[in-house]
Swiss-Prot record:
One of its GO terms (biological process) is negative regulation of transcription by RNA polymerase II. This is cAMP-dependent protein kinase inhibitor gamma. Keywords: Protein kinase inhibitor. Pfam families: PKI. Residues 1-10, 65-76 have a biased composition (Polar residues). Belongs to the PKI family. The keyword Nucleotide-binding does not apply. Ubiquitous.
Length: 76
């Protein structure tokens, strides 16, 4: 019973008492990346070619989305 009590007191004295499953702290790695840096990195992303792909593939999607009957022909 002493083992349970010592581990309980260790847990109560740590700063993770409110977390479910009491996972280890991983704050060290996440502190290195700030929200401002992440927003800047996302702002640098480019969507090259996305506009041409959407315009070029629209007729193909319309033709491919027609329902087929059980004999394999497309219905009008």
């Amino acid at each position: 019973m002493m083992e349970v009590e010592s581990s309980y007191s260790d847990f109560i004295s740590c700063d993770r008492t409110g977390r479910r499953n009491a996972v280890p702290d991983i704050q060290g790695d996440s502190e290195a990346v700030s929200v401002r840096k992440l927003a800047g990195d996302m702002g640098e992303l480019a969507l090259e070619g996305a506009e041409g792909q959407v315009e070029g593939s629209a007729p193909d999607k319309e033709a491919g989305n027609q329902p087929q009957s059980s004999d394999g022909t497309t219905s009008s």
